């Protein structure tokens, strides 16, 4: 497996693969990899000849400098895991290479229809940072396919819209959320949980699934459902952050024409902000 840190070497390798007619898959990450990331790599391997994994802690995605400073950097361990799963290249650039003009003078890519609603409303600039770095990586690596986890539902929707609007010829693949045996969605931030908090954490998904079941049975009092879920989270020990029920396709409020809903949940447990989502078929 190749490990490349500079743009010239990356471009040279991508050019070589293109000349050889190789189909390229991309898995963008911020490192601190877990089994959920490995599932993305495994999926990518089924869809391309070579798999590029990027490891870059993107400063544009962090609102708080302390959060950026404390984000785990585990490049050596990450590369060992990726070698075992058959990745072909790890691109791990420095921020100065990705943003040579500095963050203040950086040219941004924004998807305003999705970047400022829901989670974006409380995290200004976050999704603009996501779309900017993903666009840069698409331009640098020129993948045929790119794999993203469905756990970050709004992020995946934003990337799909960016690809459609910007005319990228890239197949975006959403990969189902990987969970621990007790139902907790795998996340790099789970490492912030204490032992006691880790025992509580699966309640987030259980409360979400109970809400989804009520909706599947025909309950449509959205405000009441969300208030009940928030109360359950508080009783379990969480601090609710974001609770939404939206049209799964548009991320707008449900209408009589909505065929599928998505429940979007985010809650703090200690120092960890946990997120999850669940689709609900409304056609019954």
Swiss-Prot record:
ATP binds at residues 30-37, 149-152, 178, 186-189. Pathway: Cofactor biosynthesis; (R)-pantothenate biosynthesis; (R)-pantothenate from (R)-pantoate and beta-alanine: step 1/1. SUPFAM superfamilies: Nucleotidylyl transferase (SSF52374). GO terms for biological process: pantothenate biosynthetic process. It catalyses: (R)-pantoate + beta-alanine + ATP = (R)-pantothenate + AMP + diphosphate + H(+). Beta-alanine binds at residue 61. It comes from the Bacteria. (R)-pantoate binds at residues 61, 155. Gene3D superfamilies: HUPs, Pantoate-beta-alanine ligase, C-terminal domain. It is an enzyme of class 6 (ligase). Keywords: ATP-binding, Cytoplasm, Ligase, Nucleotide-binding, Pantothenate biosynthesis. The active site is at 37 (proton donor). Its EC number is 6.3.2.1. HAMAP family: PanC. Catalyzes the condensation of pantoate with beta-alanine in an ATP-dependent reaction via a pantoyl-adenylate intermediate. The reaction proceeds by a bi uni uni bi ping pong mechanism. This is Pantothenate synthetase. The gene is panC.
